[in-house]
Amino acid sequence: MLPDSEGQKLKTFLLGTGTTLDPSLDPTGNSNFSMATTSDSSTIWTALPASQPGDKDIPTVDLAAISEAYGSTSSTTSLTSSVTSQYQYNSYPQYAMYTSANPANYYQQVTANLRAGTTAFPYSLTTPSYYGSYPVDYTSAAAAYQNPYYTNLRGGTAAPYYNPLNATTAAAYASVASSVLGTDAVNLGTSSDGSTGVPSTVTSFSLKEKKPKVSKKKKTGSCSPGDETYARVFIWDIDDIAVISRNYLASVTHTNEFYARAANSVSHLMERIALNNFADVNEFLEGDITNIEDAVVDETTMDSGPIDNLRGLDVMRRVAPKYSAFRQFYTENSTKNDVAGFKQEQNGFNFELLERVGFGAREATELYQSAIQLQTLPNFGQRWPCAQRCMDLVVEKSKLSAEKYANVVLSNDGLVLGAAQLMISGLNSSVPVENIYSISKQGKESVFEKIQSRFGKKCSFICITSGDTANSAKRLNIPVWPLNSNTDLDKLYSALDNFLLGG
């Protein structure tokens, strides 16, 4: 607290000569006082409230003197009115209030607001203004009033999502939608609820997906079983019945030079038969298929991707006509073998076949001598006739009996070379080309499953083999007839004649 003399000096310095002290001023600062200037007899405040405490940072007398010196009604601005008016239009008060000629006005206003007993909050909380009014409390009535509709910009009224149509317009839209979308009836609604404006009758119609039409060309030349029901199918391994596979002939050539020339002659004959319809060996090896039925390519009107297997679509389109020609060649040769005079002699080659593949008389004679030489090998001389007896019996019983039976052959050398081995050994008359399956690119179990799928689940299967094919058959619960010697073929013939082919 400043002494009385210092306060008097400060007041005299600030007021100058134009200021007079009110006689009611109490130098002690404990009583009420009032200050006035010569320019205006009014004051900012005349007395402090009786309940206002006196322990402030600045003495009452000094604060009153400062207020009297700088306070005048002509320069006083209400902070509440100015700030409130500015806040309604802008985010901040006017900048001119802080840069006025008399800076003390700002502090005077703040001091007045702080000293006032009840000061109104300058920033009024007004209700935010939006494009629509919302109820204060969320009640059912208020919620029902708020309709989720779009505002009609032109008319200013709320319009529903679905505008009700009159009977004529709805019928027109229904007829157009029915003709375009292919639906039987389309109801867009003709009446609406008065409270909400939503059409009371709105029937949704289902859109039918239009799938692209695919016209498939029917497979030609197919000799699949179709609707025929087979009672039993016998699966043969070509290595056990023809005994002229490439692996077998290669092993004979390396182990015994005496049979090397005869084995090479037979291998050359197989290649000549295959090349009768194909350009080279790589072509039918690259385009090898599991079954001759797979060579038929469906012609579609829409583009199709590559076939999901081991060959591409381009390869199949190139070799499909050649497989068709090979099928015809195999069928014609099998038919001639059944005609009297063209039946292949046992332990020899079909000379008609040799002539068709381009062999002359000299080459045919050499092949005949090679066949006689190879007959001295174990299981080679007697295997062909024994296997042919069994397979021919299956075909004969199938023709005479109401039940159907079939022979199926598995080839490790591919479809074309497997068919060539059957033609060389004379077994092609008992095995249609459609019943030859190649296991060179697919596993044996996959081929077995394909055979089962083709002939049906009601058909029983018997596998005649001596190799590891028996293991694959057992895993699929297919009975196996072990074949280790020619004696096993004789036993099989007896079982076929008495039990397995209907007695």
Swiss-Prot record:
Q: Which cofactor does it need?
A: Mg(2+)
Question: Where this protein primarily resides, as one coarse class?
Answer: nucleus
Q: What happens when the gene is disrupted?
A: RNAi-mediated knockdown results in severe lethal arrest at an early larval stage. The pharyngeal structure is disorganized and the anterior tip is thinner. The phenotype is more severe in a pax-6 (ju468) mutant background. RNAi-mediated knockdown in L1 larvae causes a decrease in resistance to heat or oxidative stresses characterized by a reduced lifespan, reduced heat shock protein hsp-16.2 expression and increased reactive oxygen species (ROS) production.
Instruction: Choose any GO biological process term that the UniProt entry carries and state it.
Output: nematode larval development
Q: How is the cofactor bound?
A: Binds 1 Mg(2+) ion per subunit.
Q: EC?
A: 3.1.3.48
Q: Which reaction does it catalyse?
A: O-phospho-L-tyrosyl-[protein] + H2O = L-tyrosyl-[protein] + phosphate
User: Which residues of this protein are catalytic?
Assistant: 237, 239
Q: What does the record say about tissue specificity? A: Expressed in body wall muscles. Expressed in BAG sensory neurons and in other head neurons.
Q: Which UniProt keywords apply?
A: Developmental protein, Hydrolase, Magnesium, Metal-binding, Nucleus, Protein phosphatase, Transcription, Transcription regulation
Query: Do you know which InterPro entries this protein is assigned to?
Result: EYA (IPR028472), EYA_dom_metazoan (IPR042577), EYA_dom_sf (IPR038102)
Q: Might you report a single GO cellular component term?
A: nucleus
Keyword match Transcription regulation: yes
Question: Which residues does Mg(2+) bind?
Answer: 237, 239
| Localization | Nucleus
In its UniProt record, a GO molecular function of this protein is: protein tyrosine phosphatase activity
Q: Which domain of life is it from?
A: Eukaryota
- What protein family is recorded? Belongs to the HAD-like hydrolase superfamily. EYA family.
Quaternary structure per UniProt? Interacts (via C-terminus) with ceh-34 (via N-terminus).
Q: What does this protein do?
A: Tyrosine protein phosphatase. Acts probably as a transcription regulator in the embryonic and postembryonic development of several tissues including pharynx, vulva and gonads. Required for the development of anterior tissues during late embryogenesis. Together with ceh-34, required to specify the coelomocyte fate in embryonic and postembryonic precursors. In the anterior part of the embryo, prevents apoptosis in cells that are not fated to die. Together with ceh-34 activates proapoptotic factor egl-1 expression to promote motor neuron M4 sister cell apoptosis.
Name-wise, this protein is Protein phosphatase eya-1
Query: Which organism is this entry from?
Result: Caenorhabditis elegans
